[in-house]
Every structure is written in structure tokens, then in C-alpha cells.
A protein has these predicted regions:
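N-terminal subdomain of lithium-sensitive/metallo-dependent phosphomonoesterases centered on the IMPase/IPPase/PAP
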Residues: 1-91, 256
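Small-residue (primarily alanine) positions within well-ordered alpha-helices
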Residues: 14, 18-21, 119, 217, ...
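Generic detector of well-ordered alpha-helical packing
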Residues: 51, 55, 74, 90-93, ...
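DPxDG-like acidic metal-binding loop motif
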Residues: 80-135, 155
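Short strand-turn-strand beta-turns centered on an Asx-Gly dipeptide
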Residues: 113, 140-142
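An extended, acidic
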Residues: 145-261
């Protein structure tokens, strides 16, 4: 299908979803909290904040737009009767959340059947709300843009965790990039991508993302002038190994490096 025009009330509704999630997450943040592990082979935490925030958003979607689909991290996917699908990550950065560190956020995307047409990253503790539609991006209503950075030597690189880059070929790539950039920082999750859109970070690199990890961030970064793709240069909306760059020239340079390594 072709891209659809985004109805104006959809942005307002996306912000209502963010408000509903915030009421849940702020109830639990920096308080004693039971943590479950979703996987046997590694620590993949989930809390009542994750589950409750997603449930609150799903309830609102079911009431207001029952024909829309829902793709979320904590519950089963719902196929819609229309092309529109809400893509939800109630707490992106749960490890930071349970550690009391405000490098987490609620991710809300609206996919029109072709692409994420709207993205919201809400950090209710710091009262920051990033919004993008692929053409424009804002922080709390103020327009934002990425910064120019053509060369690796001038770049700030962020990755969620160094443990993701311990084995080849990931280790080889990370060794190459980290040795050439000016600065490397860790543990940003969705917050790192928004700092890229704000013009404070130049590269964010993550392997093995899910659609709900990246779809909300794509319209924000693209609206601020940046680029988000898979490591092979393909569409990142379905997740996988993802790279985001604030400067398209730097993105092209890194893709070439990846393909040659």
C-alpha cells in the first residue's frame, strides 16, 4: 500500500497513550520492585511497570481505535482490520529502570502499513517527550535536528551494551569503530537515539533489535535529519542489526566499512 496521510487526531492520541503509560511507570520507578526474568539463557527483565503500562495503552487503543492492530513487547500481537498498527514498548531500557537510572522511555509508534509514520519517545521522569513524523521532530514542542559530523574521528558512538559485541563478526566491527571515534558511551537504549536526534550523539549501533525497539525512534531521527537502517543498509522497521547516524555522509561511510570488513 502507499503511505497514508496521518490523521491529526492520531498524534493527540499517541500523547494520550504516553500519558497513560507514565501514570503506571512513575508509580514504580525508584521503588522496591519485583523483577521477573523472561529468558532462561540470559537476564531479560520485566516488571509490573512494563506489563501495566502496556496494558493501559492497549485498553485505550481498544476503546478508541478497535480496528487498529497492536504490536507490543509484553502481550500477543493483534492484527487490525485497517493498515494502522500501534507498536508499543512500554519500558525500553528496563535494566536502567530497575537500577533507578532514567535512561529508559516509553516507545509508541504508529505504522501505516508501509512504515512507521509517527513516533513518540516519552521519558516521564525527566519530563521529556520526543515526537517525529519522518519530516519533522521535536522535544517538548521545540524543533530539533541532528548535527553535522562527516568523519569518524569527530564522532560520538553509543551502544546499549558492550556484551553484544563480544563475538565475531560483531567484535571485529566494534573494535574498528571504537578505535576510530572520538568518544564511546554505553547503556542509552532509546535515550541514545533521542540524543542523536537532539544533535549530541553521532552514531548509535545495536544488534538484534525487535520492531518495538526501533519503530518509534525512526520517525524521530529521520524527522531530525538523521538516517536509520539495518547494517546492510536495508529497512530497519522490522528490527535486526540497526545503525543510526545523525549525518547521512557518516552513515554511508560506516556502511562501506561494514561491507568491507
Amino acid at each position: 500500500m502507499n503511505d497514508q496521510t496521518l490523521p491529526p487526531d492520531y498524534l493527540e492520541f499517541a500523547e494520550e497513550l504516553a500519558d497513560a503509560a507514565a501514570k503506571v511507570t512513575l508509580t514504580y520507578f525508584r521503588l522496591p520492585l519485583e523483577v521477573e526474568n523472561k529468558e532462561a539463557e540470559r537476564f531479560d527483565p520485566v516488571t509490573l511497570a512494563d506489563k501495566g503500562a502496556e496494558r493501559a495503552m492497549r485498553d485505550l487503543i481498544a476503546q478508541r481505535f478497535p480496528s487498529h492492530g497492536v504490536l507490543g513487547e509484553e502481550e500477543e500481537n493483534i492484527a487490525g482490520e485497517e493498515p494502522w498498527t500501534w507498536v508499543l514498548d512500554p519500558v525500553d531500557g528496563t535494566r536502567s529502570f530497575i537500577s533507578g537510572i532514567p535512561l529508559w522511555g516509553t516507545l509508541i509508534a504508529l505504522n501505516d502499513g508501509t512504515r512507521p509514520a509517527l513516533g513518540v519517545m516519552d521519558q516521564p521522569f525527566t519530563r521529556e517527550r520526543f515526537i517525529g513524523d519522518g519530516s519533522t521532530a521535536s522535544l517538548n514542542g521545540r524543533p530539533i535536528q541532528t548535527r553535522a559530523c562527516r568523519n569518524l574521528a569527530d564522532a560520538t558512538l553509543m551502544v546499549t551494551s558492550p556484551e553484544h559485541f563480544q563475538q565475531p563478526p560483531y567484535s571485529d566491527l566494534f573494535s574498528k569503530l571504537s578505535s576510530e571515534v572520538r568518544l564511546v558511551r554505553y547503556s542509552g537504549d532509546c535515550y541514545a537515539y533521542c540524543m542523536l536526534a537532539l544533535g549530541l550523539v553521532d552514531i548509535v549501533l545495536d544488534p538484534g533489535l525487535k520492531p518495538y525497539d526501533i519503530q518509534a525512534l525512526m520517525p524521530i531521527i529521520q524527522g531530525a535529519g538523521g538516517v536509520v537502517t539495518r547494517w546492510d543498509g536495508g529497512d530497519a522497521q522490522n528490527g535486526g542489526d540497526v545503525i543510526a547516524c545523525g549525518d547521512p555522509r557518516l552513515h554511508a561511510q560506516i556502511l562501506e566499512l561494514m561491507q568491507s570488513s
